[in-house]
C-alpha cells in the first residue's frame, strides 16, 4: 500500500526537496506551509498530492491539518518536520517575543505534530518520523543560544519519543544539517564559512533529503541523530 507522507515546512528548502523525493517514489505527499498559495505552488512543482496551510505554533491548525490529510489521503505513515525559523542574536539582545517564537515553532510545534501523527501510526501499527534538527543543537554557536536550545531540545524529545513508541513499531529519528543552501543561509559569508567545512562546500537540500528518506525507510534505525554537515562538526 502506498505510504502517506506529511511534510511540514514542505514548500521550501530541505522540506521541499524531501517532498519532491517522496513524490518521485510514488508516495502520497502532503506539502504543508504557513502560506497556502506557496504550498500549492510547491506541491504542483514537486508532484505532491495535497497542499495545506498550517501555523505549527497553533495547535488547532495542526489538528485541522491532520484531519484534512486523513480525509484526502488516509492515515499518515511518514511524518517529516522541517518547519523552522531563525532569530539570531546574543542572548542579552534577544527579544522575549523571539524566544517564544523560536521555541514555539521549532520545538513545541514539532512536538504537537508528532503527537497528532502518532494517533494515525498507532492505528496503522507502524510509522516513521524524521525531525530536522541542526548541527547547532549538537555543538552550539555564538548568537544562536535560543535556536540551539530549540534544536537540542528536539533531539532530546526525539530520542525519548523513540523509546516510548518503539514497541508499536514506530521509529523516530533526527537529521542534523550543517550549512545547506536554503533561505536560512542566505546572507551568510559562504566563502569564509566554507573554509570550516572539510568537504569544502555548503550542502544542497537534495543531499539532506536523501538522508531523510534513508531514515524513513530504514526499519531497524530509531533514536538516531544523522549529521549531514560535510564534516563541519569536526571543526567546531
Swiss-Prot record:
The active site is at 147 (proton acceptor). One of its GO terms (molecular function) is 3-oxoacyl-[acyl-carrier-protein] reductase (NADPH) activity. Its EC number is 1.-.-.-, 1.1.1.-. Pfam families: adh_short_C2 (PF13561). The gene is cbr4. NADP(+) binds at residues 11-14, 34-35, 55, 82-84, 147, 151, 180-182. Substrate binds at residue 134. It comes from the Eukaryota. Pathway: Lipid metabolism; fatty acid biosynthesis. The keyword Ribosomal protein does not apply. Keywords: Fatty acid biosynthesis, Fatty acid metabolism, Lipid biosynthesis, Lipid metabolism, Mitochondrion, NAD, NADP, Oxidoreductase. It is found in: Mitochondrion matrix. Coiled coil: none annotated. Homotetramer (in vitro). Heterotetramer with HSD17B8; contains two molecules each of HSD17B8 and CBR4. GO terms for cellular component: mitochondrial matrix; oxidoreductase complex. It comes from Xenopus tropicalis (Western clawed frog). The heterotetramer with HSD17B8 has NADH-dependent 3-ketoacyl-acyl carrier protein reductase activity, and thereby plays a role in mitochondrial fatty acid biosynthesis. Within the heterotetramer, HSD17B8 binds NADH; CBR4 binds NADPD. The homotetramer has NADPH-dependent quinone reductase activity. Both homotetramer and the heterotetramer have broad in vitro substrate specificity and can reduce 9,10-phenanthrenequinone, 1,4-benzoquinone and various other o-quinones and p-quinones. Its main location: mitochondrion. This is Carbonyl reductase family member 4. GO terms for biological process: fatty acid biosynthetic process; protein heterotetramerization. The keyword tRNA processing does not apply. It is an enzyme of class 1 (oxidoreductase). Belongs to the short-chain dehydrogenases/reductases (SDR) family.
